[in-house]
Every structure is written in C-alpha cells, then in structure tokens.
From Swiss-Prot:
Entry's EC annotation: 1.2.1.12
One GO biological process term: glycolytic process
Active site: 151
Domain of life of the native organism: Eukaryota
Record-listed D-glyceraldehyde 3-phosphate binding positions: 150-152, 181, 210-211, 233
Similarity comment: Belongs to the glyceraldehyde-3-phosphate dehydrogenase family.
GO MF, one example: glyceraldehyde-3-phosphate dehydrogenase (NAD+) (phosphorylating) activity
Protein name (database record): Glyceraldehyde-3-phosphate dehydrogenase
Gene3D superfamilies on file: Dihydrodipicolinate Reductase, domain 2 (3.30.360.10), NAD(P)-binding Rossmann-like Domain (3.40.50.720)
Gene from which this protein is expressed: GPD
InterPro entries found in the cross-reference section: GlycerAld/Erythrose_P_DH, GlycerAld_3-P_DH_AS, GlycerAld_3-P_DH_cat, GlycerAld_3-P_DH_NAD(P)-bd, Glyceraldehyde-3-P_DH_1, NAD(P)-bd_dom_sf
Length: 337
C-alpha cells in the first residue's frame, strides 16, 4: 500500500522528491502541477541532472502523461493551487514545493481541488513545523497543512537535540556554509531586498541571513531563544555543512560528545543522524539519505563547556528524503496507510 501524492512545483525539490519516492515504494506520485514546464521538457528535466546524475529508469510521454518506469503521472499546468484537480488524479497528500505558497492560507488552496493534506517543503510562518527524528510526536491528524522546515533546520535540529538532551545547550551560534540554490544570480543583478544576494554566485562567498537556527526553537521549545545563526553561500552545486558552536550547561570532553552522537546515530536517530570519522569533503555526501552527518574529525573544543560541532548534509537529496518520510508518517497517523 502506498500514499497517493501530488507534487506542486517541479523544481529541484519537486524532482528529487519524485526520485526518492520511486526508490522508497511506499509513496505513489500520481500527479504533478507546474505551469512553467511543458510535458516534453518535464521528461528532459527529470531524466538529466547535473548533481544527481541521469535517471536510470525510463522516462517518457504517453497519452498526455509523464510516464516513469511504466508508472503514469497526471500532469497539470495551473497557476492557482485552487484550480488543480488533485482529486480527479487521486492525489490525497500534496508536496507544496514551489516556494511560493508557504503559509497555511495559501497552501490550503490545494484542499479546494480535492487534496486532504499539504506538506510544505520550506519553512512556514504559521504552519506547524516538523523535523523527522525530533518532534514527530507533536503531530496531530487535525493539521491540514504542515511544514517540513528547511534543509538546514533538518541538519541542525537532530544534532542539537542529542547534545541538548545529554548536556544542555545554554546558547549557541550556527553558521551554514551552503551550496548554491536556484534563487541566486549567475552574474551580478538586481536584488532589492538582499543586496549581497544579487551578487554572482559563481565567484563569491556571500553572507546571507537564515532562520534555520531560530527555527530549531520551534521544534525543540526548550531551545527557543538559545540559538541563532547565519549562512555563507558558496559556489558549489550541492551539499552544505553546519558549523555549530555551543556553550554547554553540563561539562563534557570532546570524546564524550563524539561517543554520545555516535550512539544516537546507531540507535534512535539511525538513518536521520549519520556519523563519520573519516577525512571527508563535501562531494562525499552527494546523495546522502541522512538529514545530518556528524563529522567527528572536524569538530574542536576549547574547554569542556565550549565546543564547535560540524555536520554535513545534502541539502537537496537528504531533505527530499525527509519530505517523503514526513508524508508517510502523516499518512500512517491519519489512517491513510
């Protein structure tokens, strides 16, 4: 049995959610909506990917549908979510991955077309936010619109939870060295709200704001107000890294912290929080399924209460895998799976 899903927005996350869904088998993508991508171009965009490689199965157009490995997917091209006939395609759960309809009010428009629930693949100002491995116990089936938070929050929150549960985080600062995303400029151009963000991504390290650290306080309330951070956008295509500096409430040696994280990665957070003690670099994590991979060799401590912790994440693939996990979890809790 599989949860029947529709995807709104066939961009980076939309396409990679589909790739993940095809791997997992417990999600059946029955419909895709994107008003800006013609069906034949949709085939091309899904088949070829600069980061994750060529799709190894079959991708074609047949009878006006996108057919992947023999599985037919209905395609819509509506600009208004309220006009998408999700119900006619049998799509119960919607992945809202346009980056546009990120509030409860806007995302709820999907419900008018027959959808039962919407998962926003981005942070939301007012939708309940969930991070797999951190706060799924707070999920309630009454929620019709939920958020999977951001890729960076998904990396940071599991690590922060492990450290906070064991040692207590008094306060912390996070920096994410973040790969390029689609909203950035290839050459210098206008960006009235974020002047630095208008500079070319190809030859710059660009400081940027991020709400990822503060958002951890929404999924771990006891950390609310204790974490904040910033981002540096760098000229790489994929895979990012979180640098978390924390002051601990309970003293611990760096080796003790490493042992704690490793234990969690092999136990309750297996598959969510990874662990490496090898001399790795960013491309070694392309296609990593985990939300966060702790790098024990990269962290440092200045004392038993002040430490820097490093965790890698594939901001495209790992995040999309969690979108799928959240869909399946919600469907099970709702009795739909």
């Amino acid at each position: 049995m599989a949860v029947k899903v529709g995807i709104n927005g066939f961009g980076r996350i939309g396409r990679i959610v589909l790739r993940n869904a095809l791997q997992l088998g417990n999600i059946e993508v029955v419909a895709i909506n994107d008003p800006f991508i013609a069906l034949d171009y949709m085939v091309y965009m899904f088949k070829y990917d600069t980061v994750h490689g060529r799709y190894k199965g079959t991708v074609e157009v047949k009878d006006g549908k996108l057919v992947v490995d023999g599985h037919a997917i209905t395609v819509f091209a509506e600009k208004n979510p309220a006009d998408i006939k999700w119900g006619s395609a049998g799509a119960d759960y919607i992945v809202e991955s346009t980056g546009v309809f990120t509030t409860v009010e806007k995302a709820s428009l999907h419900l008018q077309g027959g959808a039962k629930k919407v998962v926003i693949s981005a942070p939301s100002a007012d939708a309940p936010m969930f991070v797999v491995g951190v706060n799924l116990d707070k999920y309630d089936s009454k929620y019709q619109v939920i958020s999977n938070a951001s890729c960076t929050t998904n990396c940071l929150a599991p690590l922060a939870k492990v450290i906070h549960d064991k040692y207590g985080i008094a306060e912390g600062l996070m920096t994410t060295v973040h790969a390029t995303t689609a909203t950035q400029k290839t050459v210098d151009g206008p960006s009235h709200k974020d002047w630095r963000g208008g500079r070319s991504v190809n030859n710059n390290i660009i400081p940027s704001s991020t709400g990822a650290a503060k958002a951890v306080g929404k999924v771990i309330p006891s950390l609310n107000g204790r974490l904040t951070g910033l981002a540096f956008r760098v000229p790489t295509l994929d895979v990012s890294v979180v640098d978390l500096v924390v002051r601990l409430e309970k003293e611990a040696s760096y080796d003790e912290i490493v042992a704690t994280v490793k234990e969690a990665s092999e136990g309750p957070l297996k598959g969510i929080l990874g662990f490496t003690d090898e001399s790795v670099v960013s491309t070694d994590f392309t296609g990593a399924n985990e939300s966060s991979i702790f790098d024990s060799k990269a962290g440092i401590a200045i004392s038993k209460s002040f430490v820097k912790l490093i965790a890698w994440y594939d901001n495209e693939w790992g995040y999309s895998r969690r979108v799928c996990d959240l869909l399946v979890y919600a469907a099970k809790q709702d009795g739909a799976l």
